[in-house]
Amino acid sequence: GHDEYAGLGIQQISWNRKDYEYVAAVHWSAGHEPLLLVQNRRQTRDQVLSVHLGSEASEGSAPVGSTTVLEEHANDQWLDIIQGTPAFTPDGRLVCALNDMDADTNRLTVDGRPFTPAGWQVREVLDVTDEDVLAVVQRTPELDGYEAPDGLSPWRGDADGHDARSFDVVSFDYDGNVLPMTARPGSWSASRRGEGLVIS
């Protein structure tokens, strides 16, 4: 029938569809419940939801397909969607996008705490581990107050070329330190698995 695909059953997911009409993102990582990012029609409010997957509802457990709100965000103008968010770290921390209007920067948070520096516009999250997030960024030099622990620019003498025209791949640890993965300005992406990293 229409309710099954190739023998797979379909489970309806419940959330406040009246106030949050759009499903903006879905992410499901090993060992964790699926995440949904839902938005209102004006795309000024969103909710990050976890989807309960328990096989059978036992007394006191949430019904299969029900959701729990993990985070909510609002912006009177517009909420940007950053591909690759929301996501769980392997150890269960929640990484989300933050449209930080005070810093004029699209940032990342871990469990609600911003950890990417102001002036580093996160455009896409490529990979999330317990130690870091691999991301594509555009740097806004006039907003960039980042100081590396060694006092040196992440790109040494070439920092001026890594501005809003350059889509760079960097690693952010959860203390906000930046490790560039691309040396030259350009339009870059990457794929990482374990210790391997392919830059394209």
Task: Tell me the role of every PLM-derived stretch.
Residues 1-200:
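Peripheral, non-catalytic segments that deliver or gate enzyme domains
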